[in-house]
A protein has these predicted regions:
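Sec-dependent signal peptide recognition
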Residues: 2-11
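Aromatic- and carboxylate-lined catalytic core of secreted/periplasmic carbohydrate-active enzymes
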Residues: 312, 320-323, 328-444, 455-471
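Short strand-edge motifs at loop-to-beta-strand transitions and within beta-strands
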Residues: 450-452
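Extracellular glycoside hydrolase catalytic/binding regions
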Residues: 202-205, 216-363
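Active-site mouth of glycoside hydrolases
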Residues: 33-35, 40-277, 289
Length: 471
């Protein structure tokens, strides 16, 4: 498996190849063939450095480049088989830097001058991720920075900068509503909407600073927003802007919509425009429970197949923690596995308190799912709950290449029948994985008939099993 090879590479190799944090585009680190892109043989997945890669992750923050101990955090993720992080370009937490320079005497920002600390942190983050072959999914704009309390500290607020006034910018000094109320003119600056060049020139300058650092790296995915409900013209503008700036370099873009319902018209603005968006992020489906959480992506998967434009489906944030509001810890753990068994290309635990982050529970699941997918060729498997009978509503989930190999996930023990007719007469190996302990049970061999009865070693707990035709 590609990940195992990467895991053994000395982390200093990439660092030794570059003498600066941000290589110029003329000396890009990787050729297009090595950049992250849909897998040529199965575009529902990603390929990186020319080979398929399954992206798994979790982290303590969403704007991960801002944290102090980032290197140790990435080392931990890498050590357990993780290779995927989220990177909102957000600044609203205590201790975060903003993307513009601030005058220490006046306390005002100059939107003509980049913020050195902010961009230094981002450059370092890019370098550290690349050295560990960790893919980062950037979100250019996080709407929660532009309303309520964070807006009071935001450099774009006219009261906080020396570049424009309230009247000149059309921006409000106070926005007390949830950003979903769309009170801010910030997200209407593009030509197709209000064509507000007073703001837009500085927005472009900020994205230029981001791109001159990020584009040379091959391991970056670009998402326009965090759970937006703004006009699709906003995301369209920035997707086209990134593509224009990238030139001949391959870039992968998407938009993340606010709607929890994947059938919402919002999501069609991504799904129906593959010329703009190379992948679909369905993170908001992680508000859904149990079998519903499984069923919704299957409808989207079929919609993508019917479109003739196969693309990866990503899940960059999985809600669910006992400390949060969007499902409990069990929900988060189950969703992590259902995503991958349901055919998604990525699965990542959201930061606390709404997700499990990279705590001990998340670590066990990342390690175990990586162990399991290293035992099968996940890139040739497809969701196959149709092969399960005598199955409870949320009892088991199956991905398979029928006649070759099968993998099942049990959220809380179980006893089901697996249709192995495609392998009838063949010898099968059966091996159980205790997910919480990240340990395998001894292999058991049997002969395939029409159905195989699979009973978890214990009546409760998170279990997975791999069934393979023996050579």
């Amino acid at each position: 498996m590609f990940y195992k090879i990467l895991h053994l590479l000395p982390l200093i190799l990439l660092v030794a190849c570059t003498t600066q944090l941000t290589p110029p585009m003329s000396k890009a680190i990787m050729t297009n063939a090595d950049r992250i892109q849909p897998y040529a043989q199965n575009p529902f997945y990603w390929q990186y450095k020319g080979v398929p890669v399954l992206l798994l992750g979790g982290s303590v923050e969403d704007n991960l480049f801002q944290i102090a101990d980032i290197e140790a955090h990435l080392d931990l993720l890498h050590s357990i088989g993780g290779n995927y992080v989220r990177c909102t370009m957000s600044s609203r937490d205590e201790g975060d830097a903003w993307p513009f320079a601030r005058d220490a005497n006046t306390g005002l920002y100059n939107l003509e001058a980049p913020g050195e600390e902010y961009w230094t942190r981002f450059e370092r983050f890019l370098k550290l991720c690349a050295a560990r072959d960790i893919v980062l999914q950037i979100e250019l704009w996080d709407r929660f920075d532009f309303a309520r309390e964070p807006w009071q500290d935001n450099p774009y607020n006219p009261k906080n900068n020396t570049n424009y006034s309230l009247e000149e910018s059309g921006l409000k000094e106070a926005i007390n509503s949830h950003p979903g109320a769309k009170e801010s003119a910030f997200f209407r600056s593009v030509p197709a909407l209000e064509n507000n060049e007073v703001i837009l020139r500085y927005q472009r300058a900020q994205i230029d600073e981001l791109l001159k650092r990020a584009l040379p790296y091959p391991n970056v995915l670009y998402c326009m927003d965090n759970e937006t409900n703004e006009s699709p013209e906003w995301g369209k503008y920035w997707a086209l802007y990134i593509k224009a700036k990238a030139g001949d370099a391959l870039v992968q873009t998407t938009e993340m919509w606010d709607a929890w319902d994947l059938q919402s018209a919002q999501h069609r603005h991504t799904l129906d425009h593959p010329e703009l968006y190379a992948f679909f992020d369905l993170s908001q489906n992680n508000h859904r429970p149990a079998n519903e959480h499984w069923a919704n992506p299957q409808l989207i998967r079929q919609y993508i197949i019917d479109s003739g434009q196969i693309r990866p489906m990503n899940s960059v944030k999985i809600y669910g923690a006992n400390t949060g509001r969007f499902g409990n810890g069990r929900d988060g753990q189950e969703r992590f596995w259902r995503n991958i068994f349901g055919g998604l290309a990525t699965s990542r635990f959201h930061r606390p308190d709404s997700g499990l982050g990279l705590g001990a529970i998340a670590q066990a699941h990342i390690r175990s799912l990586r162990d399991l997918t290293d035992q099968i060729d996940i890139f040739t498997c497809t969701p196959h709950n149709d092969l399960l009978t005598e199955r409870g509503w949320n009892e088991a989930y199956c991905t398979a290449n029928p006649g070759v190999e099968y993998a099942l996930f049990f959220p809380d023990g179980g006893n089901i029948l697996l249709d192995v007719e495609a392998a009838e007469g063949e010898k099968l190996s059966v091996r159980w994985l205790d997910i919480r302990q990240s340990t395998w049970q001894d292999e058991v061999n049997t002969t395939a008939e029409n159905q195989l009865n699979l009973v978890t070693p214990k009546e409760e707990g998170y279990w997975a099993v791999v069934v393979k035709v023996m050579e």
